[in-house]
């Protein structure tokens, strides 16, 4: 459980710093990110997804992890982020391999709630 929570923390810090290399290093080489827009496969596509996602924000700072639940190789969490567009709530699901690297990621932006 602690390793999954640490992974969420490391991922959040990497995104806030726009450190895409660090963020992508948390994924296995055969990882996928499943989104409504399609599936990103492997490091190059995942990096492009992260760059594209954050390109809409000058600021993407974690305010809080509002809920987190782990079970075996899976972690799901809700978080609030401070962005230049206002407060953004997100839900994410990670499934990890035995090495603790992300093999599946389902990101779900949930909505804006005004400026913080």
Feature-to-residue mapping (PLM):
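Acidic surface patches and DE-rich sequence motifs
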Residues: 35, 83, 97
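Short, low-complexity N-terminal intrinsically disordered segments enriched in polar/charged residues
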Residues: 1-26, 116
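Short beta-strand segments that buttress and anchor functional surface loops
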Residues: 75-84
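A solvent-exposed, acidic/Ser-Thr-rich amphipathic alpha-helical stretch
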Residues: 20-71
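Hydrophobic residues on conserved beta-strands that form the core of alpha/beta folds
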Residues: 62-65, 76, 102-104
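Short, surface-exposed coil-to-beta transition loops
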Residues: 62-63, 86-92
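Amphipathic alpha-helical hairpins
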Residues: 72-75, 93
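Short beta-strand edge/turn micro-motifs at domain boundaries
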Residues: 89-116
């Amino acid at each position: 459980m602690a390793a999954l929570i640490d992974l969420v923390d490391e991922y959040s810090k990497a995104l806030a710093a726009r450190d895409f290399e660090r963020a992508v290093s948390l994924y296995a080489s055969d990882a996928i990110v499943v989104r409504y827009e399609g599936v990103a496969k492997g490091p190059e596509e995942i990096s492009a997804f992260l760059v594209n996602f954050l390109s809409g924000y000058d600021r993407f700072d974690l305010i809080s992890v509002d809920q987190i639940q782990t079970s075996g190789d899976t972690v799901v969490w809700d978080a609030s982020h401070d962005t230049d567009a206002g407060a953004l709530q997100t839900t994410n699901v990670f499934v990890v391999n035995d090495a603790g690297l992300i093999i599946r990621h389902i990101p779900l932006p949930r909505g804006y709630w005004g400026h913080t």
